[in-house]
Each structure stands twice: as structure tokens, then as C-alpha cells.
Amino acid sequence: MNTKHVTCRYFLHGVCREGGRCLFSHDLATSKPSTVCRFYQRGQCAYGARCRYDHVKPCNGSVFYPPQEMAPAPLESTPPLLPTQEAAAPVTKSAPQRREKKSVVLRDRDLCGASVEKAHPDPALRPGCAADPPVSELEAKPHSYLEAICTGLDETPIPSAYPDAPQQLCPFAQAGGCHYGESCPYIHGNVCEICGLQVLHPYDQEQRGHHEKLCMANFERDMERAFAFQASEGKVCSICMERVYDKQSPSERRFGILSNCHHTYCLACIRQWRCARQFENPVIKSCPECRVISEFVIPSAYWVEDQSKKFELIEAFKQGMGKKACKYFDQGRGTCPFGGKCLYLHAYPDGTRAEPEKPRKQLGSEGTVRFLNSVRLWDFIEEREQRNLPDAEDEVAELGELFMHLSGVGEEPPAASN
């Protein structure tokens, strides 16, 4: 079925979203319904510029839509009466007196007098239209609820969605390139000598100083990392005799730095050494080469040899470990064997930190002093309960054999001599 000869009703209302792909006709010459707003010609359109119909003023000879409640008299048949004629005219009782209706004040005064101005030059004698009120009165009294709501909105400037757009730096130029070029509404900043990006505001000196300071700090940090990587590249582990950065797994490319020693070890080898149980505690805590005891091992991605930087690394390591809860203390439910020397957090469930216990001292017979951990009575009871006691039956059997041996039972008598 061909629908091109049928006028699209959505196009008549101005809301057809198909455009050129529409199957119906968009030719207004063949459309019968009028798209002219009748309420606008009456001066009563409340939609204003948002109306979907055409707001066209009627020309001379065009059809004028009067208000529905008004019934204007014909202009040619009944001439208007002058004030003197109205006074002399006889009043007849037979003629029904029609109640005079209130005239409608049009919003557009030119619209009211466009078709009647030539016939009735006097504004007071225009039919269907009252005398024009003063302009100030029209402006003071709104004609509809919509107009009353919108009063003053047209004069108020609409704030821009980007009030500081001319003062902002272009984010595309900061990232490396803006394809808008000179037509970009944002400012293209000056090029920073350190990072090489357009991030310096040409007018804001505070922003320029802040960025230069931040950029210089990042540059110094990157240079320190580059020097640290260069110093760590050729380090060889003293246990496995392999270069640390040449290991296959990236997780193994870390150094195990001893707190009191400067020998090089990879983290996996030195941890394996300190976890051995076949040696005494002072042996496994000491360096495999110089035998200097170190309390802990610090994992690091770079080798640190300077003593000041090593102290900074140790403090950062302690602060990081101090934020993790100790699994032996277990929020007060357990006992940590390391006591106050533990690097992990000893805190109760409410967040209160536990005070480190003072170590107990014991003086030996030879004058030596030993530090003891917390001693509890239950430890002695548990040790006694777990002690292997001799079986009573074994003791009875052993005593019986001893008694029989002493009494001479079971021994063969000596042979009689001939």
C-alpha cells in the first residue's frame, strides 16, 4: 500500500522523528489541516515559544478567530451609535436586553486592531475589543498562570554550565594533544620543561609554582629509582650465587636486607636459612658470612647500602608491620613469644593497644642472667600430666622376679656325689 499521498500527522505537529525515512508525505501543500495556532491569534496561547503550532499574525482579509463566548455584531448592518444618539434613542421594553459580557483583553494589541483599525479608527468603538489599557498595566498584570510563573525569568540570565570554562586548562592538551586546535573553548597551557606537557596556566602563577614543585619531586623520585636499579642490577646472592635480577620468577627478584649486616642475599635464600631448626637460635639469626646477629630481615626491591637510607627503610618497614595484627597475640586471646620485641600490632578488639610485658630475669648459679617469658601455673600442670609414668604391672613383675631370685626359687639343686 502506497502511503506517500497521505500526509504525516506527526509532521503536521512538528514531532516526526523519522525525517526523510518517513513513509508518509511531508508536503504541506497537500495537507488540509491548518498548523496555525488559533489561540495565538486570539492572544491566549499559554505555551509561547514552546508551542508546536505556527504563531502567525493574521493579515488583512484573513480569518479572525474571535473568542467563543463573544458574539460580535456585523459591522455594515448596524452603524455604531454616537453618545448623543444613544441619549435620544427611545427605549423599547419589548426588545430583550442581553447581558453585556466582559470583553477579553488581548495580549497583542496590534493583533486586535489589525483587521478593524481601518473601519473603526477610534479604539473605544472597536467591537470585540476593549480599549487598550496602559502598557504599564499590561506589564503589571499577568494574563495566565504560566505567564505569572515565568515573570522575570526572561530577564534573568541563564547561568552557564561551565562558568569557569575560559579560565580552565584544556584536559586534552594536558594529556598530550587537543584535536580542536584554536577553536577549543579552553586555555592551552604552556609547556612544562620537566614533563613536556601543556600543564602550566599562563595567568595563574600559584598553579604554575605548585605544578613545578610537584613535577620536580616526581622527577627526583624517578632519578633515585633509576640509580637504585643501576646499583642493584649486578648484585649476586651469597647463598645461591645467582644474580637477583636474573631469577625467573618476578616475585623472587627481591633482596633480603639484614638489619645489622651489609652482605647481599636474595629474600628466598635468607628466609630459608633463618627457618632452619637443626641449629640454635643465635646461629640462624646470624649472617652466614660474618656471623653478626640481625633481629629481622627487610624485603626490598632495590639494594640499599647507604646507612642513612637503610635506617629510613627499617623505619618504614616497622611502621608497615605495626599496622598488621599479630597472629600469636590474637587480640588478647593468645600469647606472643616475642613479647615487646614483636613488630606486629598487639591490640584488643576495641582497638586499645596492649602494654608490652616486662621480661622476667633469672639469676643462675654461675652468675648468669636469663630472661624468661611469662610463666603460668598451668604450664607446670600440663607438663606433669603429659609426663610418661611407669606402668604398675611392670613394677609388680619386676619386684616378683627380684624376690624369686633372692629366695632361690627356680634354681636347680646341685647333683649328688657318688
Swiss-Prot record:
Annotated segments matching region Disordered: 76-100
Pathway entry: Protein modification; protein ubiquitination
GO biological process: axis specification; cell differentiation; DNA-templated transcription; embryo development ending in birth or egg hatching; negative regulation of inflammatory response to antigenic stimulus; negative regulation of neurogenesis; negative regulation of non-canonical NF-kappaB signal transduction; nervous system development
Catalytic activity: S-ubiquitinyl-[E2 ubiquitin-conjugating enzyme]-L-cysteine + [acceptor protein]-L-lysine = [E2 ubiquitin-conjugating enzyme]-L-cysteine + N(6)-ubiquitinyl-[acceptor protein]-L-lysine
Zinc finger (RING-type): 237-291
Makorin-type Cys-His, as annotated region: 192-221
Coiled coil: none
Enzyme class, spelled out: transferase
Annotated S-S bridges: none
Keywords per UniProt: Cytoplasm, Developmental protein, Differentiation, Metal-binding, Neurogenesis, Nucleus, Repeat, Transcription, Transcription regulation, Transferase, Ubl conjugation pathway, Zinc, Zinc-finger
Subcellular location, principal: cytoplasm
Subcellular localization: Cytoplasm; Nucleus
Gene Ontology cellular-component terms listed: cytoplasm; nucleus
Pfam families (UniProt xref): zf-C3HC4, zf-CCCH, zf-CCCH_2, zf-CCCH_4
Residues annotated as transmembrane: none
Function, as annotated: E3 ubiquitin ligase catalyzing the covalent attachment of ubiquitin moieties onto substrate proteins. Inhibits neurogenesis and axis formation during embryonic development by modulating the phosphatidylinositol 3-kinase (PI3K) pathway. Acts downstream of PI3K and akt1 to up-regulate gsk3b mRNA expression.
Name of the protein this chain belongs to: E3 ubiquitin-protein ligase makorin-2
Organism the protein comes from: Xenopus tropicalis
